């Protein structure tokens, strides 16, 4: 993938017979995806411009310039769309693009290495940070200020306050 690109949307199934497609936008404002100019595929080989967009249940329905039939739309199902990083707005304090977090080292508040950030997920109840340790299963933790008190992009790391359940601490009540 050409460097400096950020994934902002994924094309879904066709909608209707005139080439419209379902589009899942990964931007805070779903309609902002049409403000960034031409969107490109992961390999940079194809470029798309959004001609129109309207809101649907959990996605947008868009028409793309040059896509006029259902058959053309069907061939685009699953294509991820990217935009050059410099076209995105700057982040606010304590906001990050997921792409900036992937690959950062994860350390505990005591400075012990945990692994690397491999993904940020959102299953509907807030962001989840996925950390891959050098061995063993990955850790899935809430991406909150309580669990991730520090994100230091310049140092290339996130600091993790492991919940007691993960640290293996004993409960605060005696066993009966």
Curated annotation (Swiss-Prot):
Its main location: cytoplasm. It holds the Pfam family PRC_RimM. Coiled coil: none annotated. The keyword Manganese does not apply. GO terms for cellular component: cytoplasm; ribosome. HAMAP family: Ribosome_mat_RimM. Binds ribosomal protein uS19. This is Ribosome maturation factor RimM. It comes from Rhodopseudomonas palustris (strain TIE-1).
